[in-house]
Amino acid sequence: MSSFFYSTKAAKKKLYPISEALSVQDVLDVLHTHSMLSQVFWPLSITEVLEEKTTVPQSTKFTVSSLNTNNKAALTSQANAVTCTEETFLGLRFTVTYRIIDSRYNPAQIIIHDIFQTESTSSLINSTTLPLETRLYLEEERSLTAPKPLSSLMKMKDGPIVKTRNLLFFLEEMSRNGADMASAIASLKASVTLAGEHGQEKTKED
């Protein structure tokens, strides 16, 4: 998009620990299985595949429909990551990349965000500067591109967006059930449905 008409805002990258029960391949299988990942990102919406490209880089385009919205989205795989781009009718484009980070190849000090050490996944994030253990982390990198008249009204949300919360919940469930994706997605959908019944709202950025 031309920067003359659009403005982009980026959030700080964040790392979230992945259960030691999961391997790099376990997580990659989730990130690169677009049909499953679309259910993780939009568990209560209807997703329809518009176009699927199986050559490198693998990509899938969807329409994502819920009660009041009908957006376009795309998932694109990279070697150790996946990028999700979602566009709304207002011309807003939300982009988030999830990347697997192995702590053995990263600096000794980094900001760690762990939503599973709080009372529940809906609690506020604990953020601490700690030496990295030898384990895997999920890196979240996100940005928002909007037409300049709207960009001044848009703010990047603090904390994990809904897609990130869903993905972390899904991975945690996989770590408990032997990497069974079907059971993990069923648990996620049940959790999201229950949260909706209790009136939890999602923000525009999610």
State each model region's role.
Residues M1, I111-H113, E119-T129, S191-D206:
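Fungal intrinsically disordered, low-complexity polar regions
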Residues M1-K72:
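Hydrophobic ligand-binding cavity/cleft-lining segments
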Residues L37-P43, C84-G91:
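Short, solvent-exposed secondary-structure boundary motifs
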Residues T55-T60, R104-D114, T118-T128, F170, ...:
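Noncatalytic linker/hinge segments flanking ATPase motor cores
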Residues K61-S66, V82-F89:
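Short beta-strand segments that buttress and anchor functional surface loops
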Residues Q78-A79, T95:
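Ordered, amphipathic secondary-structure segments that act as subunit-interaction surfaces
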Residues T85-R165:
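Beta-strand/loop substructures that line and gate deep hydrophobic ligand-binding cavities in soluble
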Residues L144-E205:
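A conserved amphipathic terminal alpha-helix motif
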